[in-house]
């Protein structure tokens, strides 16, 4: 598996300060995609042991909230097979940090409720290691810059542990409180 880029100290792709890994390879080809170069599975650099260790080291400070997996498409079967051991290791090293994943596939597709070409032998385990899944393809006609942590209004922020327990999609509830102050 290759990665297109890694963003350290990212604040756009999940709560808090995170390390975001943009994998290469995507078959969705959403019109208006912000990362078209990552559609190509051969784009970027190999996701080798040195890179994985660099990511693990970047997450050591207490102020790092976790990692986010983006793309490209993390749930393309080729990428899932490489990401699973990485996420397992991340969970072992940092059990109190979160793992977010952005996928053009929907919850219903990834859990096998509807047909999905991306489901493979590791899908269920990889899904079980996530805290939040931002699901659904980017839809340019539904693009909304006011949405937090997603690009179009069809996309959902799903609490994966609660969704797995309920056997149905459960929206992630943002604990962040925003307030304005006047004098």
Task: Tell me the role of every PLM-derived stretch.
Residues 76, 141-142:
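Short glycine-rich, flexible loops that bind phosphorylated cofactors or substrates
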Residues 131:
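Receiver (REC) domain switch/active-site residues of two-component response regulators
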Residues 86-91, 143-183:
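P-loop/Walker A phosphate-binding loop and immediately adjacent motor/lid segment at beta-alpha junctions
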Residues 1-3, 17, 35-116, 121, ...:
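Conserved Radical SAM active-site core
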Residues 1-22, 31, 35-42, 169-174:
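N-terminal [4Fe-4S]-dependent radical SAM core
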Residues 28:
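Glycine-centered loop/turn positions within well-structured domains
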Residues 125-128, 151:
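Short, conserved loop/helix-junction motifs that constitute active-site signature segments
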């Amino acid at each position: 598996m290759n990665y297109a880029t890694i963003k350290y100290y990212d604040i756009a792709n999940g709560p808090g300060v995170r390390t975001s890994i943009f994998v290469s390879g995507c078959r969705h080809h959403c019109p208006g995609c912000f990362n078209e170069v990552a559609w190509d599975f051969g784009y970027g650099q190999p996701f080798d042991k040195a890179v994985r260790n660099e990511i693990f080291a970047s997450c050591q400070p207490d102020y790092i909230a976790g990692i986010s997996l983006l793309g490209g498409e993390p749930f393309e079967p080729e990428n899932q097979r490489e990401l699973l051991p990485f996420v397992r290791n991340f969970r072992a090293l940092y059990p109190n940090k979160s793992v977010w994943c952005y996928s053009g596939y929907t919850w219903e597709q990834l859990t096998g409720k509807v047909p999905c070409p991306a489901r493979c032998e590791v899908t269920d385990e990889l899904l079980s290691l996530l805290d939040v899944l931002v699901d659904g393809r980017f839809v340019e006609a539904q693009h909304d810059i006011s949405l937090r942590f997603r690009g179009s209004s069809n996309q959902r922020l799903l609490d994966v542990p609660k969704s797995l327990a309920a056997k149905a999609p459960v929206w992630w509830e943002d604990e962040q409180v925003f307030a304005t102050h006047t004098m």
